Amino acid sequence: MARILIVDDDAAFRDSLAEMLQDLGYTVLQAETTDAGLHRLRTEDVDAAIVDLRLPGEDGLVFLRRAARISPVPCIMLTAYASGGNTIEAMSLGAFDHLTKPVTRAALIETLERALRRAANTPDNPQAAGASPAAKEPVDGTELVSSSEAMRQVFKRIGLAANSDATALILGETGTGKELVARALHRNSGRATGPFVAVNCAAIPAELMESELFGHVKGAFTGAITERTGRFREADGGTLFLDEIGDMPLATQAKILRVLQEREITPVGANRAQPVNVRIIVATHRDLPSAVKEGRFREDLWYRLQVVPLWLPPLRERLGDVLLLAEHFLRLLGGDSPKRLSAAAA
C-alpha cells in the first residue's frame, strides 16, 4: 500500500489524519516541521505528501520548493482558509491540489487517490509535466497563437497549472480566448485523454441549470420522462469548463461550492450523492469582487475559485498579435492553397 507523509505542526490534527489514512490501509509517516519532513523524504520511500502551508519556521512553500529537488512526489497542501495568496503560490510551485481544514474523509480519499494515480502515470523526467503548451498544440483552430510578453506569461502559468487538479479561474473580456486557455490546460494535463466538456452558464435558463449540470432521475419533475446524465458525469475522468460562471444563479453557486468541497454531486430528484472525478475550470468576463459586494455572487465560492487565476489581456493591448492571428486564420481556412497577406495589407 502507498506510503503517505503528513507534515503538520498540530499533533492532534496530524494524529487524526494519520488514523483516517491508516484505516484506509495506507502506511503513514509523520513530521511536524519542514526540515523533519524533508529528512523523511530523503531517507524513506514516500508516494505522496500532505503538507500544511503554515508551519513553524520554514513554511509549506519552502517544503514544496525543496521537495521538488528531492523526489517528484505529489504534494497536497492543507489550508485553514478557502484560498489566499499562499495557496496560489503553492499551486504555481507545483502542488498537486489543496484541501481546506477541517478535511472531510470523502475529500481526502478522492484527492489522495487522484494524486497517487497521477504519480503512477508521471514519467521520471520532472520536466515532462511542465512542458510548454506549444509542444502539444493542435492545428485545428483551438490552439493559442501569440508572441506578446503578456501572453507568454499566460503560457507559463498554463504550463505550471496544467498538471495540477486545482480549480483554475480564467478572467478576461469577451473574445480574449478563455475557452482556448481552458482547452490548453486540459490538453497539457494528465486528464488529456479524458473528456473536455464546456458549458456556457449564461445560455442556460436558471430553472434548467441544475438538471443540465448534475443530471436528474426519471420522474424528478414534470417532463422528466427519462434519466439525464448531466455535464459533471459526462466530464468524469476529464475536465469540466464552466464558462461565464458570473451569470450562474446563486442557488446553483451553492451546489458548485459543495462539489468543490466534497467532490460529489446529487442529481435532481436523487436521494444519494455520487462521486465525480473532474477538474473544474471556470471563466468569466464579469467583475466578481463587485458581484460579491452586490450580493450576486457567493463570497465563499469566489475564494474557492481563485486558486489558480489566469488573466487574459485583450487584443488591443497586444497589437503585435494582430498580423500573427490574421496569417494563422488564413492558413487554417485556406485548405490546400492558403492565401497570404500582401506586403501592403501587412
Where are these predicted regions, by residue range?
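Acidic catalytic/metal-coordinating carboxylates
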Residues: 33, 59-62
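Active-site beta3 strand of CheY-like receiver
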Residues: 44-50, 55
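Nucleotide-binding/hydrolysis machinery
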Residues: 106, 110-117, 189-194, 269-279, ...
